[in-house]
Amino acid sequence: MPVKIPDDLPAAEILESENIFVMSETRAANQDIRPMKVLILNLMPNKIETETQLLRLLGNTPLQVDVDLLRIHDKESRHTSIDHMNNFYRDFEAVRHKNYDGLIITGAPLGQVEFEDVSYWDHIREIIDWSQQHVTSVLFLCWAAHAALFHLYGLNRKLLKEKRSGVFLHKRTHRHVPLLRGFDDEFLAPHSRFAEMDVQLLKAHPALQVLTESDEAGAYMVLSTNNRNLFVMGHPEYQKSTLKDEYFRDLGAGLQPEIPQNYFRHNDPGQDPVARWYGHGSLLISNWLNYYVYQLTPYNLDDMSGITPWENEV
């Protein structure tokens, strides 16, 4: 949360140059506060596991968040009961008339399927287009990040020969952006995907900025220049056992998956994995929710023209 200081305090310029969040008395006096309304489009097979992971991160912030869960269609899920889906999830028709402070679209196990061949691709495109007018900030995770970059900017992914699974070291490529406040120069994050985006294509696009990347795993966090869309190529929401569960699931299915990199102790699947990304995963979600949702969203969600752009603030 911000430090409120007098409008012309000399320390303000120093703190801002260090990427410390300060707020002038004038802005603080005119700031309205209410719960943040966040919509989650859950595309993962195990709905309960994924919603729990995301709610755990959203709940680790000082903000009150009202969450709505969205499903892509009303077809029965193989891994989640129909009662759970009907009781807790909404169809798009029930929310399309609403505005939201934030939207999270999860990954999906579709890494080797062409976007146009995805059965609900038209629905995904419709929701992405809708979000650009009805949501202050959208967080796209893993497959959803690739899908949105393709739909919004025409940038296609490239398929990998082997699934990229593991925990990889990343570095910051930008310093003075609110999203990276509190981040170390290098940090770890988990990945689990069959495709990647070309880093140079992302960097060359005038509407995008690559904030963090990995020598092994490529681009990780990409932000649109209007600060409305955040694309995260990995899984900051994953728990310690998630990659392990995926690995043994694939083994049980008769596949020959590579052992997730930098994950199991001594690279031995017989030993417990080590979670070394929780801190930065939590910080990523907290910074997104605070700086790109709470600080920018209009108090009156019926008027999306009230979004406060960061360019007037930095």
Swiss-Prot record:
Pfam hit, one: HTS
SUPFAM superfamilies linked: Class I glutamine amidotransferase-like
Entry coiled-coil feature ranges: none
Pathway where it operates: Amino-acid biosynthesis; L-methionine biosynthesis via de novo pathway; O-succinyl-L-homoserine from L-homoserine: step 1/1
Active site, per annotation: 142, 235, 237
Site-annotated residues for Important for acyl-CoA specificity: 111
An individual GO BP term: L-methionine biosynthetic process from homoserine via O-succinyl-L-homoserine and cystathionine
Entry keyword annotation includes Acyltransferase: yes
Subcellular location: Cytoplasm
Main location group: cytoplasm
Site (Important for substrate specificity): 192
The reaction(s) this protein catalyses: L-homoserine + succinyl-CoA = O-succinyl-L-homoserine + CoA
Role played: Transfers a succinyl group from succinyl-CoA to L-homoserine, forming succinyl-L-homoserine.
Record family assignment: Belongs to the MetA family.
Full protein name: Homoserine O-succinyltransferase
Species whose genome carries this gene: Shewanella sediminis (strain HAW-EB3)
